[in-house]
Each structure stands twice: as structure tokens, then as C-alpha cells.
């Protein structure tokens, strides 16, 4: 299964350990651009279909998780923080 492109770019731009800024993505959400809407749709798709593996995430975000359950708990926390006004993500890799 392929990881959607816009989701991959959001990981590189906002969630990579060298540039960890989910608050910047959250700020961009307020502008509701077409790009942000694509990211949200693709983030929804990733959470539903679960194509991101621990190895993929480690390669693209430079962050390791022990298992996919922990990874997807973290991704759900990021989604809630960015798109639903949830708290800052607390799950760590």
C-alpha cells in the first residue's frame, strides 16, 4: 500500500525530528487552503487504511516507534491536535 504524497510531505515538513513543528501545521489549518484540505483527507486515509509502517515512519520522520499500535496512537494524537483542537501529542517513539 502506498503512503499518500501530501501526507508524506507533511511528515517531512512538520513532523521530522530535525524540524518538529506540528504547531506550524496547526496554524496553517486555520487558513483552510486546498493544500491543507488535501493533507487532512490523506491523513484521514492513512488513519483508516494504515499504510504507514514503523520502518517507513523511521525513515521519513527520523523517529522510531516500537510497534504500529504506538505509531498510530501517536498519529491519532497529532491528527487530534492539528485538526480537532486536541492536546499536544504525548506518545513518544
Language model region names:
Residues 1-27, 79, 86:
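Short terminal alpha-helical segments
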Residues 2, 34, 38, 66-73:
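Alpha-helix boundary/N-cap detector
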Residues 10-15, 42, 60, 72-75:
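Aromatic-residue detector
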Residues 15-57:
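Amphipathic alpha-helical interaction modules
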Residues 60-93:
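Amphipathic alpha-helical binding modules
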